[in-house]
Amino acid sequence: MKLRLGLPKGSLQEATFQLFKQAGFELTVRSRSYFPSVNDPELEVVLMRAQEIPRYVHEGVLDAGLSGLDWILENEADVVEVADLVYAKSTPNPIRLVIAVANDSNIKSVSDLNGKRIATELVRVTQKFLRENGVNAYVEYSYGATEVKVPHLVDAIADITETGSSLKANNLRVIATILESTTKLHANKESWNDPWKREKLQNLAVLLQGALRARARVGLKMNVPGDRLDTILAILPAMKQPTISQLVNSDWVAVEVILEERQVRDLIPALKRAGAHDIIEYPLTKVIP
């Protein structure tokens, strides 16, 4: 038996392949191929546009897939969310679907969009947001290059932004956020009800989420004199309690801890001053709580 899995082709492909590699899955794809090989005989991987994956999962063409919440909502796909995977093309943060207008536009708020023309790839999601805010505007589908359509072709756009740099480069300002979106591992309902496929998906989710957790953390090892241990422990942040091991024939102990990478820059000098020796920092592949 195989699990048929849809992965996004295009801007999110490289980040997705890197995540799968960290999780233990080697994906190899030939030029112009849409069917990568993978070092797991129980997986069949198909590359396609993220916009289409939820529809094919909903219809049962795929057992499961990775796509953003925005595209799941746009496709009105009735699927099972297996795991929330917070990563994007260039940052580890959620993306936003925003409404933006030209910097010099008279449009200041959502209510000013009444009777205006808006371009977007996410027509249904945008229309729903406008209805909920009592706005009657014309929403048209954009086939790409959405940012350049303001103000010459449309009054506003609803577009995905990760860092905001593209909007700024096109002299646009945000007047509203429609939603925040993260990548979802989602499954077809019938596939989810199959015990083998459910277990396979749950195992995949554990590995992918473990890989994402590891990206923000590192491990630290150090040797500490016994009389300095309490001082060292007082300044060590940790997921749980640090691991402490007595060194053979010594009054020293080995201390090991997992912590946020952003803490290391200030922590290592502090540990050294507090009496720690032989400090080693090492990367993590997966963190499974």
UniProtKB/Swiss-Prot annotation:
Classification via InterPro entries: ATP-PRT_HisG_long, ATP_PRibTrfase_cat, ATP_PRibTrfase_HisG, HisG_C, N-reg_PII-like_a/b, N-reg_PII/ATP_PRibTrfase_C
Keywords for the protein's UniProt record, in alphabetical order: Amino-acid biosynthesis, ATP-binding, Cytoplasm, Glycosyltransferase, Histidine biosynthesis, Magnesium, Metal-binding, Nucleotide-binding, Transferase
Residue stretches spanning the membrane: none
Activity regulation info: Feedback inhibited by histidine.
Classification via SUPFAM superfamilies: GlnB-like, Periplasmic binding protein-like II
Cofactor(s) this protein requires: Mg(2+)
Chief location bin: cytoplasm
Cellular component, GO annotation: cytoplasm
Group of enzyme by EC: transferase
Catalyzed reactions: 1-(5-phospho-beta-D-ribosyl)-ATP + diphosphate = 5-phospho-alpha-D-ribose 1-diphosphate + ATP
One GO BP: L-histidine biosynthetic process
The protein's annotated pathway: Amino-acid biosynthesis; L-histidine biosynthesis; L-histidine from 5-phospho-alpha-D-ribose 1-diphosphate: step 1/9
UniProt subcellular location: Cytoplasm
Pfam families linked: HisG, HisG_C
Any GO MF annotation of the entry: magnesium ion binding
EC number: 2.4.2.17
Family: Belongs to the ATP phosphoribosyltransferase family. Long subfamily.
Function recorded in the entry: Catalyzes the condensation of ATP and 5-phosphoribose 1-diphosphate to form N'-(5'-phosphoribosyl)-ATP (PR-ATP). Has a crucial role in the pathway because the rate of histidine biosynthesis seems to be controlled primarily by regulation of HisG enzymatic activity.
Alphabetized PANTHER family for the sequence: ATP PHOSPHORIBOSYLTRANSFERASE, ATP PHOSPHORIBOSYLTRANSFERASE ATP-PRTASE
Protein name in UniProt: ATP phosphoribosyltransferase
Designated gene of the protein: hisG
